[in-house]
Each structure stands twice: as C-alpha cells, then as structure tokens.
Amino acid sequence: ISEIKGERQGVITMIYDHGQRGLLTTLADIQHDFMSIIQASLHSHVTHDRCLEVILVRGDGSQIKTLVEQLMSHKGVESVKLTTISVQD
C-alpha cells in the first residue's frame, strides 16, 4: 500500500474463505478495534466457501492503512483492495 496521508474517505473490498477456522472471529475483532474509522460494512455470500465484504472508512490515512494491513495478514483472506480520496479542501 502506498503512503496514505491526511483525512481520507474510502472503501475496502475483501474476499475471504469463510470456512477458514477462526477467521470470522478474527476479522470481526479487527473491525471492532477500528470502529472509530469504520462507517459501515456490507457482507455478501459469493459462493458456499467465499464471502465478499465491503467496508466504508473515514479517518486518518495511517489508521486506514493499518486496518488494511491487519485484514490482509490472515490465512484465508484472498484479496483486500483499498480505494480512498482526500476529504481535505
């Protein structure tokens, strides 16, 4: 992830294997740890084994980057993409 600075708003898209032991709890715990920057999330069942999560974020770029890195670091997470825009004038 490139350097993300300042106040940002954006979306994280994540694809993961919901059958991976302990992963759902881990991902929920991470999201609770970052509830100050997570505005909303949407969960979709893509197949029997794969899920898509869309997470809306707003906050300091370094916090958003840390959240993405934590989500990416777990076995069973197949893809994490981040798109942000500066909210500063």
Place the predicted regions along the sequence by residue:
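Long, contiguous binding/interaction regions
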Residues: 1-89
